[in-house]
Amino acid sequence: METVTRKPFTVSGRRITTQAQAETQPETAQIGPLWQRVFQELKTPPELAYGVYTAYEDREFAHYDVLAGLAGDYPLEDADSLTIPGGTYLKFETSMTEDSVCQACMQLWQEVWTFFQRTGAPERCYDCDFEEYSQQGKQLAIYIGIKGK
């Protein structure tokens, strides 16, 4: 994990509203189907893909929005877009294989949640967090916005 400063950039794609409890049950989970839709629409895997978490109702426990897509313009009509704010983020990283993307993502999020439960951990701003998937390098990075830096 490292502290990084990111400049603002725009991500375009498909958006859903969900909540953590719904994502724990296969019959109500929406994030996996969202990614399936995006990759079906794109047909060719992009070099970089983004999963953006925003509009937190009450931290990560209530409703929040997830946008899955690409930096810049999405190649299909009626796409949603948002600007990831520039600022200070904690960056958590892991390697993955094509067959282990979901498992790697869940394990890395578990690492994030455990880190922020520690005494003295920086305060999350709950404005915008995002996942960055590198198809070529098979890397996953999760960026968590933090306050006071």
PLM region spans:
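A solvent-exposed interaction/effector surface
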Residues: 1-149
